[in-house]
Amino acid sequence: GKIDENQFCLPETMYGCNKLYCEHLGRYYSIYYNRLSKNYKSGLIDFRAIRFPGLISAYTLPTGGTTDYAPEMLHAAASNKLYTCFVQQNTTLPFMIMDDDIESIIKLMSTKKDKLSQMIYNVGSYSVSAIDFKNIIMKYYKNAKIEFSVDLKRQSMVDSWPEDVNFNAAMSDWNFSPKYNFENSFK
């Protein structure tokens, strides 16, 4: 099922560890920094963070991240190049396109602090499999060349991640609502 912000908090990658470290550091400075001081006051900073799913952009080339198989597939098809996907066809992860990503940042940052129930928020749009990506890309790029050859090490990392995220808190607290679903992301 969909996971919330308090689940999957024991990452198996340095990337995940660093993301959580930054969240904890932000929470510390926002609530606890300098609390032994006579002049202690909570709220030194107004810390807010978003946990993004895999991001897809038609303009920004992917840089080899583990969720980049989807945008790599798209960019290879647009360039008429063969793409070998490194995850299993049924691998399912959450994604969103860059427009919704940017909109989520703007919405969270412009929301008054007293409207927020937490500091860390999940966002997302759709959760689909690698074969779903291939199929929709083939719909728009009839001559695309996409094959699958699983990289077991990368697959094991992906297998430790959630297939979908619950972003109800973002919807409730700051009216996050993705404009793009899987189908209209590719039009």
What are these regions (language model features)?
Residues 29, 73, 137-141:
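Short amphipathic helix/loop within the catalytic HATPase_c
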Residues 8, 42, 49-64, 72-96:
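A conserved pocket-lining segment of Rossmann-fold NAD(P)-dependent short-chain dehydrogenase/reductase
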Residues 2-8, 14, 53-55, 92, ...:
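Active-site pre-Tyr helix/loop in NAD(P)-dependent dehydrogenases
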Residues 81, 86-89, 94-187:
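C-terminal substrate-binding subdomain of Rossmann-fold SDR/epimerase-dehydratase oxidoreductases
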Residues 4-7, 11-23, 63-71, 94-95:
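Short-chain dehydrogenase/reductase
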Residues 20, 43, 55-71, 98-99, ...:
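Glycine/proline-rich active-site loop of Rossmann-fold NAD(P)-dependent oxidoreductases
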Residues 10-48, 77-79:
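Active-site Tyr-X1-5-Lys
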